[in-house]
Regions:
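Non-catalytic pre-domain segments flanking phosphatase-related domains
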Residues: 2-5, 16-64
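Sec-exported extracytoplasmic/periplasmic mature domains
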Residues: 52, 56, 76, 112-120, ...
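Metal-dependent phosphoesterase signature
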Residues: 71-72, 77-105
Length: 214
């Protein structure tokens, strides 16, 4: 019986290693490396330390990207690699609807801290707004959802992130009923997640070698 159990787990371990070794280096680094895990945790830890020192009032907020900043979509990358496919909006939409993304390392502790301090979070993501309910479902499954969070997802191709950030600064567009906010921190995995004009808040950028505009 013992030999059977050992053999069974050996087969599982071998299969995992074999499939893992077939992944592109960028995806394998995110999925398996201690460096990726450590970096993400360090970024969230540093942000926690910094925000403890910041005065927070009703006008304060942080702007966060979602994918590869809060939500870990490496499983999507694994699946399209196994199929010999590359990114497409069709497969990506199906993945988002599944609401199966995991958390970026360190995110849960950071969100617990944010909730205790009652800091307003505004999510500005290029996920399409038509899939907001699936995104919320995913956040709930990960136990980081809060009904006070604001989601400014993409309405159409012209609805760039800088446009939505400007709505936050000026209290216009979808922020009209809420009012303007003072941003004390930005979180993202690409340069487009950060403001060039209103850079008073600290910026925290996460490693994402899997995709981007380079």
């Amino acid at each position: 019986m013992k030999k059977s159990i050992i053999f069974y787990f050996s087969i599982i371990a071998f299969s995992f290693c074999a499939s893992s070794s077939n992944l592109p280096n960028d995806v394998r680094w995110v999925v398996n490396s201690g460096e990726y895990d450590k970096l993400c945790r360090q970024i969230y830890s540093q942000a926690t330390e910094d925000l403890v020192k910041v005065f927070i009032d009703g006008q304060s907020a942080i702007i966060m990207d979602l994918d590869e900043t809060v939500l870990d979509n490496s499983q999507y990358q694994i699946e399209i690699n196994e199929k010999g496919e590359s990114f497409s909006m069709i497969s990506w939409a199906k993945w988002v609807l599944r609401a199966e993304a995991k958390l970026v390392p360190g995110a849960k502790h950071f969100f617990d801290f944010i909730r205790k301090r009652n800091i307003q979070i505004i999510f500005i993501s290029n996920r399409m707004n038509e899939r907001l309910s699936s995104t919320v479902k995913n956040m709930k499954k990960l136990n980081i959802y809060n009904e006070k969070d604001i989601y400014l997802l993409r309405l159409d191709k012209a609805d760039k992130k800088y446009i939505r950030r400007n709505e936050v600064y000026t209290g216009t567009g979808r922020m009209r009923a809420i009012g303007s906010k003072k941003i004390v921190a930005y979180f993202g995995d690409a340069m487009g997640d950060f403001s060039l004009k209103n850079s008073l808040g600290k910026e925290y950028i996460f490693p994402n070698p899997m995709y981007g505009k380079w």
